[in-house]
Curated annotation (Swiss-Prot):
InterPro entries given in the database record: Ribosomal_uL16 (IPR047873), Ribosomal_uL16_bact-type (IPR000114), Ribosomal_uL16_CS (IPR020798), Ribosomal_uL16_dom (IPR016180), Ribosomal_uL16_sf (IPR036920)
Sequence similarity: Belongs to the universal ribosomal protein uL16 family.
Entry GO terms, CC: cytosolic large ribosomal subunit
Protein name listed in UniProt: Large ribosomal subunit protein uL16
Gene: rplP
């Protein structure tokens, strides 16, 4: 699973995810991509589940690019613990994904296989998604 090797701060504040993604909105490596239509935290387990779903459907043919990384820790306190007494222990790792971000890319397989693999991966994620295709000239993604 994806986890950072080393972090500067073990516990981080949640913050807000407002607006659209600034970068990473186009398909750059493969021919097809999976774009987020909502903003959400995506855990390392969800990223791994989506990756496994894609590679199994493609029967290990082609190539998958994961363009998000779970860099923030999230914390939670125990079940029977009262309020106060500091922040809870780190539970896992999440990748903040804003709307418009291309999270996964696929290349080296036919269009039907790529679309179905990305559709299966989208079902593993907590955001609404759409499949975008790389444009030949401008490199911009469009919905097909």
């Amino acid at each position: 699973m994806l986890v950072p090797k080393r972090v500067k701060h073990r516990k981080v504040q949640r913050g807000h995810m407002r607006g659209e993604a600034k970068g990473g909105k186009t398909v750059t490596f493969g021919e097809f991509g999976l774009q987020a239509l909502d903003s959400h935290w995506i855990s390392n387990r969800q990223i791994e589940a989506a990756r496994i779903a894609m590679t199994r459907y493609m029967k290990r043919g082609g190539k998958v690019w994961i363009k998000i990384f779970p860099q923030l820790s999230y914390t939670s306190k125990g079940v029977g613990v009262r309020m106060g007494n500091g922040k809870g222990a780190p539970e896992g790792w999440v990748a903040p994904v804003k709307r418009g971000k291309v999270m996964f890319e696929v290349g080296g397989v036919s269009e039907e296989v790529a679309r179905e693999a990305l559709r299966l991966a989208g079902h593993k994620l907590p955001v609404r998604t759409k499949i975008v295709q790389r444009e030949e000239v401008g490199g911009q993604s469009n919905e097909k």
